[in-house]
C-alpha cells in the first residue's frame, strides 16, 4: 500500500514525485524554471514540513525566489493541506555517495498521486534558508531506501538482510536457529521450513538471511528469493504468447527447478489461484525429491492457509513449521540499538526506551519512529533527547485507515456519475472504460492487493487487464492534464473520506 509505513523518507519521495509532476505540467513556468527543480532530492517529511536538498546556492535562490509560490501551491495540491519546504544545500561529491539512499525520483511514473497524513506539529512554518555549512558526514541516515533497493538482480536477495543484522529474542530465537541450520545445509529434517507470523516481524529478513548465508558458504549454489506475486506474474507471463507458451513454460520450469535453495515469501497470496498453485505444486515436488532446500513464509500457519489443496498443505507440514511473534520490550530495545549502530547514530538510552515502550507491534514501526526522531533532530540542529522524541512522536500514534477497493470503486463511480455496477460490469464504452482503468490504478496504488485480486473485485477480470489499466493510466497521466487531475482529485477525496 502507498505510504502505509508512515516512514518520513518514503512519504517525502512520494510527495515530491507528485509535486514535480504538477510543476512540470504548469504552463506558467518556463523550461528554465522547471530545470531548476530537476536536481532537488527529497529527504523527509516532519509534520507539515518537507525537507528538500539542493546541490548549490543558485538553485536554492531560484526556488526560494520566483518558484516559491508555485512550489507551495503544488505541495498544497498534492497533499490537500499547507506544507512548507525546508531546504538543505548538499554539494555533490565525486564519486557520488550511494545514490540509491536518496533517489531524486524514486517512483517516477508508476506511483499514483498520494496524500500523506501529517501531524499538526510543524518544524519550520516558513521555507527555511539553507544552512551555511553542509550537514556533517555523521548525520544519521537510516537505510530504509537502501534496504528496499539493494537487491541482487540474479538471486533477488536483499544483501542487507543477514543473520548478523537480525536481532534474536524470545519471540524469534527458535526461528533464527532453525533458519541458520537450513542456511548451513545441516537442516535436512527441516525441509521444507515454513516460517509464519504477522507483518513486519522479520520473516522476509530471515528468508534473505538464509539465502545470503548459503551463498557465503557455497558461492556456487543457485539461490532464488521470490514473492508469491512475482512467481504468479512470471508464470502468467510464460502463458501470454500462445505460439511460444510451451517454450516459455519450459524456461520457467528450468528457472525454478534448477535452484538449490528456493525462498518464497507471502505464500498466502497464492490461495485460490488454481493454475499457479498447480505449477507451484509440481515445482515443489521436483525440488523436494531432489533434496533441494525450500523455505516458505506466510502470515498464517500452513494448516490455516485458505484456497490451498490438502495435498500442498500436507507437503508444507512435512517439514518444520516455526513462528515469529511481536518482539518483547528487551528485544525491541536491542533492535533499536542495532539500527542506530548500523548507521553510526548515538541515541540516548531513555529515547530508545521511550520508542520501545510506545511501539510494540512490529519492527517496521520501531524503525520508522527512530528515523523520524533522528531526522527531526538533524533538521532542527538539536540533540536527540527524550523531550524531542515525545514531541516528534505525539502525532505518530494515529493509525491510518486502510482504503478498501470497494471504497475506491464507489468514489470513482460517484465522481464520474456512474454506478458501482458500471465499473465492475462488462461495458467497454469509453465513458466507462477510462473511469474503470482509473479505479484499477488507484486500487493498485492505494491498497496492498495483488493485480489478480484487484481483477477479481472488478468483475473477475484477469491479471493482464489490470496490468494494462495501470500502465495505461500511468502513461496518460504524463500526457494528459485532465487524466492527471482526475487521479489527483480522487486521491484527495479518498484520503479525506477515510480519515473523517
UniProtKB/Swiss-Prot annotation:
Cell compartment(s), UniProt: Cytoplasm
Pfam family, one: Bac_DnaA_C
Record region (Domain IV, binds dsDNA): 378-500
This protein's record includes keyword GTP-binding: no
Stretch list, region Domain II: 81-155
Residue positions binding ATP: 200, 202-204
Region (Domain III, AAA+ region): 156-377
Major location category of this protein: cytoplasm
Any one biological process term the GO annotation gives: DNA replication initiation
InterPro entries on file: AAA+_ATPase, Chromosome_initiator_DnaA, Chromosome_initiator_DnaA-like, Chromosome_initiator_DnaA_CS, DnaA_C, DnaA_dom, P-loop_NTPase, Trp_repressor/repl_initiator
Gene3D superfamilies found in the cross-reference section: 1.10.1750.10, 1.10.8.60, P-loop containing nucleotide triphosphate hydrolases (3.40.50.300)
GO-annotated molecular function: ATP binding; ATP hydrolysis activity; DNA replication origin binding; lipid binding
Keywords, comma-separated and alphabetical: ATP-binding, Cytoplasm, DNA replication, DNA-binding, Lipid-binding, Nucleotide-binding
Family per record: Belongs to the DnaA family.
Domain notes: Domain I is involved in oligomerization and binding regulators, domain II is flexibile and of varying length in different bacteria, domain III forms the AAA+ region, while domain IV binds dsDNA.
Quaternary state and interactors: Oligomerizes as a right-handed, spiral filament on DNA at oriC.
Protein name: Chromosomal replication initiator protein DnaA
Source species: Bifidobacterium longum (strain NCC 2705)
Amino acid at each position: 500500500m502507498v505510504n502505509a509505513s508512515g516512514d518520513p523518507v518514503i512519504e517525502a519521495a512520494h510527495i515530491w514525485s507528485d509535486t514535480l509532476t504538477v510543476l512540470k505540467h504548469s504552463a506558467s513556468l518556463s523550461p528554465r524554471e522547471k530545470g531548476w527543480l530537476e536536481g532537488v532530492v527529497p529527504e523527509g517529511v516532519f509534520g507539515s514540513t518537507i525537507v528538500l536538498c539542493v546541490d548549490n546556492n543558485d538553485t536554492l535562490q531560484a526556488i526560494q525566489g520566483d518558484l516559491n509560490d508555485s512550489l507551495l501551491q503544488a505541495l498544497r495540491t498534492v497533499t490537500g493541506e499547507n506544507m512548507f519546504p525546508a531546504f538543505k544545500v548538499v554539494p555533490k561529491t565525486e564519486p557520488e555517495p550511494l545514490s540509491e539512499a536518496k533517489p531524486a525520483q524514486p517512483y517516477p511514473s508508476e506511483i499514483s498521486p498520494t496524500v500523506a497524513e501529517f501531524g499538526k506539529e510543524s518544524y519550520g512554518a516558513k521555507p527555511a534558508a539553507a544552512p551555511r555549512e553542509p550537514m556533517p558526514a555523521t548525520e544519521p541516515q537510516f537505510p530504509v531506501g537502501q534496504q528496499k533497493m539493494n537487491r541482487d538482480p540474479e538471486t533477488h536477495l536483499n544483501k542487507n538482510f543477514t543473520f548478523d543484522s537480525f536481532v534474536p529474542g524470545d519471540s524469534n530465537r527458535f526461528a533464527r536457529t532453525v533458519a541458520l541450520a537450513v542456511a548451513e545445509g545441516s537442516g535436512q529434517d527441516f525441509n521444507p521450513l515454513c516460517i509464519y507470523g504477522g507483518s513486519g516481524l522479520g520473516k522476509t529478513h530471515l528468508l534473505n538471511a538464509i539465502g545470503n548465508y548459503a551463498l557465503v558458504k557455497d558461492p556456487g549454489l543457485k539461490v532464488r528469493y521470490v514473492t508469491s506475486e512475482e512467481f504468479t506474474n512470471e508464470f502468467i507471463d510464460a502463458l501470454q504468447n500462445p505460439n511460444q507458451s510451451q517454450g516459455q513454460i519450459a524456461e520457467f520450469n528450468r528457472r525454478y527447478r534448477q535452484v538449490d535453495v528456493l525462498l518464497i515469501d507471502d505464500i498466502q497470496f497464492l490461495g485460490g489461484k488454481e493454475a499457479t498453485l498447480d505449477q507451484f505444486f509440481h515445482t515443489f515436488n521436483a525440488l523436494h525429491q531432489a533434496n533441494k532446500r525450500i523455505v516458505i513464509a506466510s502470515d498464517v500457519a500452513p494448516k490455516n492457509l485458505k484456497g490451498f489443496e490438502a495435498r500442498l498443505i500436507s507437503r508444507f507440514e512435512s517439514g518444520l513449521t516455526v513462528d515469529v511473534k511481536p518482539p518483547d520490550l528487551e528485544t525491541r530495545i536491542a533492535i533499536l540499538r542495532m539500527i542506530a549502530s548500523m548507521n553510526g547514530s548515538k541515541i540516548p538510552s531513555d529515547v530508545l526506551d521511550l520508542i520501545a515502550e510506545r511501539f510494540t507491534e512490529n519492527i517496521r514501526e520501531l524503525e520508522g519512529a527512530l528515523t523520524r526522531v533522528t531526522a527531526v533532530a538533524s533538521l532542527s540542529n538539536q540533540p536527540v533527547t527524550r523531550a524531542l522524541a515525545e514531541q516528534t512522536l505525539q502525532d505518530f500514534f494515529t493509525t491510518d485507515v486502510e482504503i478498501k477497493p470497494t471504497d475506491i470503486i464507489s468514489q470513482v463511480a460517484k465522481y464520474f456519475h456512474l454506478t458501482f455496477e458500471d465499473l465492475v460490469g462488462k461495458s467497454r464504452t469509453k465513458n466507462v472504460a477510462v473511469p474503470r482503468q482509473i479505479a484499477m490504478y488507484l486500487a493498485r496504488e492505494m491498497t496492498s492487493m495483488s493485480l489478480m485480486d484487484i481483477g477479481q473485485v472488478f468483475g473477475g477480470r484477469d491479471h493482464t487487464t489490470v496490468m494494462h489499466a495501470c500502465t495505461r493510466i500511468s502513461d496518460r497521466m504524463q500526457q494528459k492534464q485532465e487524466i492527471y487531475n482526475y487521479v489527483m482529485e480522487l486521491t484527495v477525496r479518498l484520503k479525506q473520506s477515510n480519515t473523517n
